[in-house]
Amino acid sequence: MKKRALVSVSDKTGVVEFVKGLLEQGIEVISTGGTKKLLEENGLQVIGISEVTGFPEIMDGRVKTLHPNIHGGLLAVRDNETHVAQMNELGMEPIDFVVVNLYPFKETIAKPDVTFADAIENIDIGGPTMIRSAAKNHKFVSVIVDPVDYDVVLAELKENGEVAEETKRKLAAKVFRHTAAYDALISNYLTEQMGEESPETLTVTFEKKQDLRYGENPHQKATFYKAPFAATSSVAYAEQLHGKELSYNNINDADAALSIVKEFTEPAVVAVKHMNPCGVGVGTDIHEAYTRAYEADPVSIFGGIIAANREIDKATAEKLHEIFLEIIIAPSFSKEALEVLQSKKNLRLLTVNIEKATSASKKLTSVQGGLLVQEEDTLSLDESTISIPTKREPSEQEWKDLKLAWKVVKHVKSNAIVLAKDDMTIGVGAGQMNRVGSAKIAITQAGEKAQGSALASDAFFPMPDTVEEAAKAGITAIIQPGGSIRDEDSIKVADTYGIAMVFTGVRHFKH
């Protein structure tokens, strides 16, 4: 008995050549709708689906393969005598190959003007049913959902006259990944349409972007996956112009740097090490901003990641070229800047659209045995809701420094303290188990520059000791959430030393 293949694809990449290869192997091809038309236009002889089902395609193609003659041919266990007898009795023929990919639901809902009706119409029913049937019976049926696998299948057919059992299993596994991802997209779309924020089950799907050399450490394996609708202003959508392949740590650090630089509308440069900012500078142009970011911590920036929110020009590139850096991220690089920076063969240069998120996306954090889901912390300082509990209010320059420090401190590992002065950070205290410890680190780093600077804290002061340390260092303004039962103690110390203090009412823990 001749082997049969059923071919019905939305993505027609390579399908003509593949079907030609099947026909050359003596395999009959059944096809539907647009796929059948394309194959026939290319001179290939195929059988219409209606000839197999004895039933016309109806309801604008919604019902064409949902028929016992199709699914009996797919699901029949060929070495089961009862199955074979029933097939013979009902005049069914086995189907040995299924070549199907699904309606473009993802592409449809990605359109800015998509309607709900359009989205629903692009939910495939017959396709998933066929490929799931075929994948379940993969011992006897080869099922191909990805054009990438066409050459593998044809090569095995030409060499061995059949597809290897291991290949069939791999193809079947791909089918169930494919349908799971497809259903997750549909589930998430409908859930969002209904405004459900915490559904009883969470379905997520990610697409493989690249294998990584290793993970956080050389003994850990790692892979980079991107969300199907990831923001274009993300590392997942960055274009690499030059340099070595990105590592696991590179991607983490680049993501952190991007998150910080998006906080600024004026020209800004951020330097990051181990996902914490070591220097942030703003200026009238990107060269001035970089100079300040570098001067913020010229030691820690070595081997760091740089993110800028303006094009890198030649003058800035020449300064960047002077030190060892892992990555430079910017919206663009001038031709002259590229010529300067590409002389370092390992330096990774990335371009990405840099724009602050207008709405909070979901942040997923894995824990042992589960997953935490929360909104990203995209909240900006709202000056209409702040309060100033101290006798003195910040000066204009202090306000400027406070705002810069507050934008940065939300991106520093808690407990976090950031000092800023004259359009740059001058001290960063990160990840300490007590707040005053982080303050001491930031103050020590700032040295004499701490005099007249502004301090930001990601959470309230449980005791007045941090304010006391700030006063000793000559810090003149503080911004913090407030809300401690001992706020009055901190306010009293601030007033004693003439420090202006701002309460935001918003905490920015980061773990």
UniProtKB/Swiss-Prot annotation:
* Enzyme Commission identifier(s): 2.1.2.3, 3.5.4.10
One Pfam family name is AICARFT_IMPCHas
Q: Which GO terms describe its cellular component?
A: cytosol
Q: Which UniProt keywords apply?
A: Hydrolase, Multifunctional enzyme, Purine biosynthesis, Transferase
Q: In which pathway does it act?
A: Purine metabolism; IMP biosynthesis via de novo pathway; 5-formamido-1-(5-phospho-D-ribosyl)imidazole-4-carboxamide from 5-amino-1-(5-phospho-D-ribosyl)imidazole-4-carboxamide (10-formyl THF route): step 1/1; Purine metabolism; IMP biosynthesis via de novo pathway; IMP from 5-formamido-1-(5-phospho-D-ribosyl)imidazole-4-carboxamide: step 1/1
- Reaction(s) catalysed (UniProt annotation): (6R)-10-formyltetrahydrofolate + 5-amino-1-(5-phospho-beta-D-ribosyl)imidazole-4-carboxamide = 5-formamido-1-(5-phospho-D-ribosyl)imidazole-4-carboxamide + (6S)-5,6,7,8-tetrahydrofolate; IMP + H2O = 5-formamido-1-(5-phospho-D-ribosyl)imidazole-4-carboxamide
An example GO BP is:
'de novo' IMP biosynthetic process
Q: List the disulfide bonds.
A: none
> Sorted alphabetically, which Gene3D superfamilies does this protein's record hold?
3.40.140.20, Methylglyoxal synthase-like domain
Domain of life where this protein originates: Bacteria
Report the residue ranges that make up the MGS-like domain in this protein. Answer: 1-145
User: GO molecular function terms here?
Assistant: IMP cyclohydrolase activity; phosphoribosylaminoimidazolecarboxamide formyltransferase activity
Record remark on domains: The IMP cyclohydrolase activity resides in the N-terminal region.
Instruction: Output the NCBIfam families linked to this UniProt entry.
Output: PRK00881.1, purH
- Protein family (similarity comment): Belongs to the PurH family.
Q: What is the designated name of this protein?
A: Bifunctional purine biosynthesis protein PurH
> Which source organism does the UniProt entry give?
Bacillus anthracis
From the broadest rank down, the organism's phylogenetic lineage runs:
Bacteria, Bacillati, Bacillota, Bacilli, Bacillales
Q: Which gene encodes it?
A: purH
